């Protein structure tokens, strides 16, 4: 590969770098493929864990990068990407809380910002040609920086397996901690961790205990429930168990609490954007609790038409996020409308955690539309039940006319 005629036209490229096997191989490949090309490594800290960042700069430089930029995006990710998404009620195909999908636009945006800062003329990612992420990243690049060249090595090089990558690095004396026996492909951030590959590729195989990393097995969770209280302001959690916390810190605390009770596991076969189906196991402990809490308060404060509208756009928003269309006018509009509704989502909620379940058992709100005096079956001075007769006649008028016309 190093003896091939080198390409020209790219002098400086910013690579989305994780330190894993793929991106470790991409750095020398870029240097060998493009003539006189400088590689800038970029890593987005979206809450994947401190252990993932230790030694990252040294590893990037040893692989041939001239610089490594690690950008802390944790608070911005939760505040400006997670909360706007869950405000719309978006859940992909009724189950998936979009953990990987939500992280891609902020990573792409930060990558473009680094590219502008260092004067790069190209960006590069390590996504495979079979997955969703290539579309998400490149869709964001197109929206934010259409002038930058996009390099996708997995669609260009001849390597096809982990063994190929390991041999490639060994030939160049580039050290890696990866091995050919890696079982699962994982992607982690503050919201969740995903698991794919290995025995999971056969949907008849039950996930082994070794798959899960954030949550205990529900059957092994404590035999006594735990109650966690959330204070919510404008659709965002501000306090956990009466402790004021930043958006990111609140999510981390809930991840820890809920994970101990086996909350937030799903095992799904989803429809990928590129046309194929894939199986994934996801853990979203804190996010599951947040979602349950916010939905409980919404039940108190949103009227029927508002909730109906929100349910209608939830599916559309889930596809926009999943398909990498974050930086589009429609996505921006749906978020703005949903956050307007969230202005009244204020109050307190108590979530019961028990063996994999997160259930809202107490809720209150200063904006509540629920009235015990209205809802009671007892006598009251507010609602005259006789008024229902006229309403019902008008409400059923079309049905009445249709029936008369068919006689």
From Swiss-Prot:
Assigned keywords, A-Z: Amino-acid biosynthesis, Arginine biosynthesis, ATP-binding, Cytoplasm, Ligase, Nucleotide-binding
Entry GO MF terms: argininosuccinate synthase activity; ATP binding
Annotated binding of L-aspartate, by residue: 128, 132-133
GO cellular component assignments: cytoplasm
Primary enzyme class: ligase
Pathway: Amino-acid biosynthesis; L-arginine biosynthesis; L-arginine from L-ornithine and carbamoyl phosphate: step 2/3
Gene Ontology terms: biological process: argininosuccinate metabolic process; L-arginine biosynthetic process; urea cycle
Top-rank taxon: Bacteria
Amino acids binding ATP: 16-24, 44, 126
Subcellular location(s) per record: Cytoplasm
Pfam families referenced in this protein's UniProt entry, alphabetically: Arginosuc_syn_C, Arginosuc_synth
Binding site for L-citrulline: 96, 101, 132, 136, 185, 194, 270, 282
Chemical reaction(s) catalysed: L-citrulline + L-aspartate + ATP = 2-(N(omega)-L-arginino)succinate + AMP + diphosphate + H(+)
EC number: 6.3.4.5
Family: Belongs to the argininosuccinate synthase family. Type 1 subfamily.
Subunit structure: Homotetramer.
Name of the featured protein: Argininosuccinate synthase
